[in-house]
């Protein structure tokens, strides 16, 4: 793979997670929120955020985690809303855990595992974010320090939790915001318009689904990681988003 350029757009202090330190100690958790799973992910804890088979959050704690609330990042895997696995971001989980950050890897409905459309994937992403905020204290996470990240279509989902307010699971409590504190986006799909990615699948609702069509001035800070050889998540689109 040839990567000629890595471009970072708008890095703010909230994204420099390593500045947040956690005191050493033991993590003691006992709750009926947690479930067993035969998935091959090496998560410390698994949560269920909705009633679908894919409605699971895989939680990875720092070895120095305490019962005090820590910052957290929820990651959404890529795969064109067609397929993929939360395992995609296990290496990022391992890295961020070293800095006292709790990492949550979200599963969600895709065309392959549920026969669904990109709209259901976004509904699930927002449900996952709301669930994480609602239950943050139970898993020793600071609800005001939850970031969202993802790659490709997962980057779209992360961005859309912040920008796209019209698409929601009707079962969600909309009084709970899905907006993260900040965004960590790897080659994200942010333009789903007529000249963007996936328009043929979302054309009937793209104005509510496409992050670049919904960005507001008060949007949370974001960092973009892009490669100039990427022909799907095109760099100039992200420059437009930054502007």
Task: Tell what function each PLM region has.
Residues 180-214, 220:
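Mobile cap/lid helix-loop segments that gate and shape the active-site cleft of serine hydrolases
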Residues 237-243:
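Conserved small/polar residues in nucleotide/adenosyl-binding loops
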Residues 32-66:
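N-terminal cap/lid segment of alpha/beta-hydrolase-fold proteins
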Residues 117-136:
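Alpha/beta-hydrolase active-site loop
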């Amino acid at each position: 793979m040839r990567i000629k350029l890595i471009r970072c757009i708008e890095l703010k202090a909230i994204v420099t997670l390593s500045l947040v330190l956690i005191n050493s100690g033991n993590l003691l958790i006992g709750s009926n929120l947690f479930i067993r799973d035969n998935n091959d992910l090496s998560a410390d804890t698994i949560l269920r955020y909705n009633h679908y088979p894919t409605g699971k959050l895989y939680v990875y704690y720092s070895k120095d985690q305490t019962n005090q609330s820590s910052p957290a990042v929820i990651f959404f895997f890529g795969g064109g809303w067609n397929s993929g696995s939360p395992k995609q971001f296990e290496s990022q989980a391992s890295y961020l855990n070293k800095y006292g950050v709790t990492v949550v890897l979200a599963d969600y409905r895709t065309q392959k595992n549920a026969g669904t459309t990109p709209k259901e994937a976004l509904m699930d992403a927002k449900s996952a974010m709301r669930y994480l905020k609602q239950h943050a204290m139970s898993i020793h996470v600071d609800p005001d320090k939850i970031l969202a990240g993802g790659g490709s279509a997962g980057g779209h989902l992360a961005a859309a939790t912040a920008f796209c307010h019209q698409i929601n699971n009707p079962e969600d409590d909309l009084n709970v915001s899905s907006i993260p504190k900040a965004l960590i986006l790897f080659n994200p799909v942010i333009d789903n318009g007529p000249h963007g990615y996936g328009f043929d699948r979302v054309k009937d609702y793209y104005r509510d689904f496409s992050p670049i069509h919904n960005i507001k001035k008060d949007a949370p800070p974001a960092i973009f990681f892009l490669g100039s050889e990427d022909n799907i998540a095109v760099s100039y689109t992200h420059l437009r988003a930054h502007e």
